[in-house]
Swiss-Prot record:
GO terms for molecular function: DNA binding; zinc ion binding. There is a cross-link at K11, K112, K121, K146, K262, K420, K437, K683 (Glycyl lysine isopeptide (Lys-Gly) (interchain with G-Cter in SUMO2)). Keywords: DNA-binding, Isopeptide bond, Metal-binding, Nucleus, Repeat, Transcription, Transcription regulation, Ubl conjugation, Zinc, Zinc-finger. GO terms for biological process: regulation of transcription by RNA polymerase II. A zinc finger (C2H2-type) spans 27-49, 55-77, 81-103, 160-182, 188-210, 216-238, 294-318, 475-497, 503-525, 625-647, 653-675. Belongs to the krueppel C2H2-type zinc-finger protein family. It is found in: Nucleus. GO terms for cellular component: nucleus. This is Zinc finger protein 770. SUPFAM superfamilies: beta-beta-alpha zinc fingers. It comes from the Eukaryota. May be involved in transcriptional regulation.
Length: 691
């Protein structure tokens, strides 16, 4: 007997060591054959098979099988744990403590003190919910150890798998909610807009969009939000602002209160909940510490961080600093070179603006044999040259045959003109030297002076006044926002918006907005077209006549050239330039009726790079074929015949696919390409097959 008792005690001790006691489960379910220790547990288990849920919630009418589940559910309606910083409610202590750790990194030191207060609140709110057990009863109810498979099953996570996608979930309710994605069901429907959602929380968030109420208000700037999460993100902006934190601490010192701990900018929260409560409850403090975070003082725009504010263009221009990203990306020497190169390009554009004046000016030099020929003696008298710019008067050429220089007007020297072989570089600035010294002086010797000068940076990205001869457009249109350089052009532009055409033709009644357009139109009614007296050619308008007469030179020879000798001839141009008189000793005998040009002049025109035969030939093309209807002139009879189709309204070329007609064959062929299509094998339909 003693041996048997010892064996029993040994077994009990082994069970105690293994955290296990022998169980006796005599009560078996006749449906699923599960075993239970007590009849109460068996009766509770029968509710699963019958589907009964006798415990109902008075608030939301949700039913449960056990009373403990109902009491735990009722905590969701009361939420006894409230955060003093963000005013958020929690139903249990564990989630509330985790939430407090997010607000403050050093909150773990005060966890014990907070737990005592919260446990006292929890005991009051949870009174009568949980039954207290003794140590022996807890041991009897929970005898299983970690090695027991039932224990590992309870501790296992994500044990509910979806049969469609195989995704795991920790509970059946979350699995059921996930199945709604596959079935496409959205049981929660909005009454106002009939929009449906899978979860009730999503529906509640959506219903806030229909109301103009903003229940969540910031205690610092009084800004309202519909969702609490957006309010929390907004408060982090205040806590990241250094000026806001400094002002908050200063406010605390003046009120002779204990100085709060340093605010954590990384976590974006406060050290304790008392600060948030005082700021929210005291309205005077709210208005005194109202600061818009990271706001530009010029344009009043707000930014998320101080770095973005420093890179803001208005803020950088006001403070005289260059953005940090601009300094990192480029070296200041390269920036200086780029800006100066931009100024040089702006200066060099002047040469392109006066190409027509250069050609006229060049012709007058080529006619002057004094400047081209280097074989003539230096004892000849000085000859006068009438320049192309009549407003500057008459300019003399100095008879120095070694330098071959010519004194020009002041405006031509400022433009950087340097005619090869005629002018020296002493009197005229080159393109490299055309940049003003003022632009170079303001840059500064060091990189800091250069980057801190906003005028230099602005001139690098906008063309200054001194470097380009452009008229400033100061008269804007209030309808289309176009800008014009003078009020007269603005008034002329207003006629487009009003639709007025004040200049009417007396013959056909057609009206125009400008008098120049009316004069050009009246040429079509005249019997005689503009007439060139030299070559006896008629033109359709005065523009063609002026271009023709400006490019031709009238040679009036006093007598025919029979043999080489010393003779005089006059060269006169028909445009605004005054006449040029020159003398020469060498003539080339030409045929009768043709002007005689000096040998040196012909050689210079052939060898001069400025002379272009193609340009001269294109400008002197004669329009000999004139339309009898609109008096328009053409170079060839084929173009005139094609033009007559416009007056006749004929379109002889017809598309065989869509029946569209065209006036010209190229237009018809180009239209045929629109009907091209690629076959499935990748072969393209041929043009002949389409035609």
């Amino acid at each position: 007997m003693m041996a048997e008792n010892n064996l029993k005690m040994l077994k009990i001790q082994q069970c105690v060591v293994a955290n296990k006691l022998p169980r006796n489960r005599p009560y078996v379910c006749n449906i699923c054959f599960k075993h239970f220790e007590t009849p109460s547990k068996l009766a509770r288990h029968y509710l699963i098979h019958t589907g009964q849920k006798p415990f109902e919630c008075d608030v939301c009418h949700k039913t449960f099988r056990q009373l403990v589940h109902l009491e735990r559910h009722q905590l969701t309606h009361s939420l006894p744990f409230k955060c003093s910083i963000c005013q958020r409610h929690f139903k249990n202590l564990k989630t509330f403590v985790k939430h407090q750790q997010l607000h403050n990194e050093t909150y773990q030191n005060n966890v014990k003190q907070v737990r005592r207060l919260l446990e006292a609140k929890q005991e009051k709110s949870m009174y009568g919910v949980y039954n207290t057990f003794t140590t022996e009863e807890r041991w009897a109810l929970h005898p299983c150890s970690k090695s027991d498979p039932m224990y590992s099953m309870k501790r296992r996570k994500n044990i509910h798998a979806c049969t469609i996608c195989g995704k795991m979930f920790p509970s059946q309710s979350k699995l059921d909610r996930h199945v709604l994605i596959h079935t496409g069901q959205r049981p929660f429907k909005c009454v106002l807009c009939t929009k449906s959602f899978r979860q009730s929380t999503h529906l509640k968030i959506h219903q806030l969009t229909h109301s103009e109420e903003r229940p969540f208000q910031c205690c610092f700037c009084q800004k309202g939000f519909k969702i609490q999460s957006k309010l929390l993100k907004h408060k982090q902006i205040h806590t990241r602002n250094k000026a806001f934190r400094a002002l908050l601490l200063k406010k605390r010192r003046t009120e002779s209160r204990p100085l709060p701990n340093k605010l954590n900018a990384n976590q974006g929260g406060f050290e304790n909940g008392e600060i948030g409560e005082s700021e929210e409850n005291n309205p005077l403090d709210v208005h005194s510490i109202y600061i818009v975070p990271f706001q530009c003082p010029k344009c009043e725009k707000c930014f998320e961080s101080e770095q973005i504010l420093n890179e803001h263009s208005c803020f950088a221009a006001r403070s005289g600093k260059i953005p940090s990203r601009f300094k990192r990306s480029y070296n200041y020497k390269t920036i200086v070179k780029k800006i100066l190169a931009k100024l040089k390009r702006a200066r060099s554009k002047k040469l392109d603006n006066f190409q027509s004046e250069k050609k006229v000016f060049k012709k007058s030099f080529l006619r002057n044999c004094d400047l081209i020929s280097g074989e003539q003696s230096s004892e000849q008298t000085q000859r006068t040259f009438v320049g192309s710019l009549g407003k500057h008067g008459t300019y003399k050429t100095i008879g120095n045959r070694k330098k071959k220089t010519l004194t020009l007007p002041f405006s031509w020297q400022n433009m950087g003109k340097n005619l090869k072989g005629i002018l020296t570089t002493e009197n005229i600035l080159s393109i490299d030297n055309s940049v003003n010294k003022k632009d170079l002086s303001i840059c500064g010797s060091s990189g800091e002076e250069f980057f801190n000068n906003c005028e230099v940076l602005q001139c690098g990205f906008s063309v200054p006044r001194e470097n380009i001869r452009t008229r400033h457009k100061i008269c804007p249109c209030d309808k289309c926002e176009k800008v014009f350089p003078s009020i007269s052009k603005l008034k002329r532009h207003y006629l487009i918006h009003t639709g007025q055409r004040p200049f009417g033709c007396n013959i056909c009644g057609k009206s125009f907005r400008q008098s120049a357009h009316l004069k050009r139109h009246e040429q079509t009614h005249n019997e005689k077209s503009p007439y060139a007296s030299l070559c006896q050619v008629e033109f359709g308008n005065f523009n063609n006549l002026s271009n023709h007469s400006g490019n031709n030179v009238n040679y009036n020879a006093s007598q025919q050239c029979q043999a080489p000798g010393v003779q005089k001839y006059e060269v006169s141009e028909s445009d605004q330039m005054s006449g040029v008189k020159a003398e020469s000793q060498d003539f080339i005998p030409g045929s009768t009726g043709q002007p005689c040009l000096p040998n040196v002049l012909l050689e210079s025109e052939q060898s001069n790079p400025f002379c272009s035969y193609s340009e001269h030939q294109e400008k002197n093309d004669v329009f000999l074929y004139r339309c009898s209807v609109c008096a328009k002139s053409f170079r060839s009879p084929s173009k005139l015949e094609r033009h007559y189709l416009i007056h006749a309204g004929q379109k002889p070329f017809e598309c065989s696919v869509c029946g569209k007609t065209f006036r010209q064959a190229p237009h018809w062929k180009r239209h045929q390409l629109t009907h091209f299509k690629e076959r499935p094998q990748g072969k393209v339909v041929a043009l002949d097959s389409v035609m």
